[in-house]
């Protein structure tokens, strides 16, 4: 049985997107997605939105629907990536793309090579995939590799019991 979600606002509001298997991804809850874009909508127009752990690409799709200059979803899991590609292609937006690969390896060069500012959205598959036990330490290391002047904002979805240190205090 396939699972679906819908784009909640913007140009593509109501467009149905497929969700990958719950065994490899954890989709952002609709209430979180809607609340996030209600807050950020007026700021997103000049930004490149990068979804570091794309899953279905729903956040990148929502970003382009709400007027982001460009949106990119990165997904490592091959099966999830195929769904991401299909979802993004269904929107027929030239400013929306999917990349299959490791976010930790790809993000520093991708962000540091951008012409404009980036809104980086990170919702890693903590507690789901093998090898993600030290996910937050990896994220802190990733952030240390980014040029501050390229970042407009970094958004993390994380377990509520984890507290980031001063490493991210320089970012909005």
Regions found by a protein language model. Name each.
Residues 1-66, 77, 82-115:
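S-adenosyl-L-methionine
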Residues 2-9, 19, 98, 119-123, ...:
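Accessory RNA-recognition modules of RNA-modification enzymes
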Residues 54, 78, 105, 126, ...:
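Short, glycine/acidic-enriched loop or turn micro-motifs at the edges of active sites
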Residues 69, 94, 152:
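Short acidic/polar active-site loop segments enriched in Thr and Asp
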Residues 70-75:
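Conserved SAM-binding motif I beta-strand of class I
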Residues 114-172:
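S-adenosylmethionine
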């Amino acid at each position: 049985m396939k699972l679906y979600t819908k784009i909640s606002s913007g140009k593509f509001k109501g467009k149905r997107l497929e969700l990958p298997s719950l065994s490899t991804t954890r989709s952002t809850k609709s209430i979180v997605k809607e609340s996030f874009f209600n807050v950020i909508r007026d700021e997103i127009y000049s930004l490149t939105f990068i979804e570091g752990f794309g899953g279905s690409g729903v956040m990148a799709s929502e970003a382009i629907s709400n007027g982001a200059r460009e949106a990119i979803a990165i997904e490592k899991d091959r099966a999830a990536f195929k769904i991401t590609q299909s979802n993004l292609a269904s929107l027929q937006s030239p400013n929306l793309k999917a990349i299959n690969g490791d976010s930790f390896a790809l993000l520093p060069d991708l962000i540091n090579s951008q012409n404009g500012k980036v809104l980086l959205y990170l919702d890693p598959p903590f507690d789901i995939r093998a090898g993600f036990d030290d996910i937050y330490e990896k994220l802190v290391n990733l952030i240390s590799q980014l040029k501050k002047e390229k970042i407009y904002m970094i958004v993390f979805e994380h377990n509520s019991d984890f507290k980031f240190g001063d490493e991210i205090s320089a970012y909005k």
